[in-house]
Amino acid sequence: MRLLLQNPYLLILFALLLTTPSGFSQPTNPRFDAEADLLLSHFDSKTDVDDIHSVAAFATIMSSEPFSQINHHAVAGAYGIQEGLYVPANELFEAAFGERWSDAHTNFNQALSEVAELVSETLETGGDVWVAECGQSDFTAALVQEIQSVHPDLDTSSRIHVVQHSNWNESSATPEKLKFVQGNTDYHKIPDGNAVGNGTPGFNTADSIDWKDSISDPKLISLWETAIAIANRYNGQEGRYLNHNISVGGFDFSDMAEVAWILNQEQMHNAEVFFITFGK
């Protein structure tokens, strides 16, 4: 190490050797086991349209190497007690995930049954379950209760991991359901994904981004065009929350700070870096 400090050229070479070609970090102790675990993203889509951008961002991550083989599933309509209208985006979920999504807005019980089956399959084969709580914890509470009823001997506090970044999401959940999730899962409250420089990525910006310069997959380009169109259509409409950054042509997929954290990619700085990293 003394030699490295004395020779700046060796120090630069050493730093380059530690940098992975793909741009992704290579953690020594990864949180998520890509070969065994299940990754769930629960979107509320009520009433902020940021979840619409987040759906496209989640699909982008799951399409990229080295994450394209991850077992994943999305849930729409995983909202809590907040007032206001839902943002319908079934065509986006279908384009993003195919059969890998469930509609809790239209049929809560069916969605619960579908996701519980996936969770049980993962747990029974030795994997853990990770939930990116992109909305409130009401659906997750029902899911954990269902798993406990089917697997009464399972310690859900060590096998089901829930990641939440938003104080507002927590305050908009049914209080007793949030408390249940916090007490019956491995619950992680991480820094807010709306800001940069706090330990997680800041995926909320008013800045326009030349995202098409970074994404090469035509399907992903179409997916983002659909997401942007839906978000613009419903943003601030009929009493829905007005997302300022989206209204001026920016981006808000702040919930994806949770997925970045789960996958040990929390060093990613902002939305522009996201597109450069995952759009390859």
Q: What spans do the regions from the language model cover?
A:
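Bacterial N-terminal signal peptides that target proteins for export
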Residues: M1-L10
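Compositionally biased, low-structure terminal segments
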Residues: L5-Q6, A15, S25
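Bacterial N-terminal signal peptides
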Residues: Y9-T20
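Bacterial Sec-dependent signal peptides at the C-terminal "C-region" and cleavage site
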Residues: L18-T28
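N-terminal acidic, glycine/proline-rich low-complexity segments
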Residues: Q26-K280
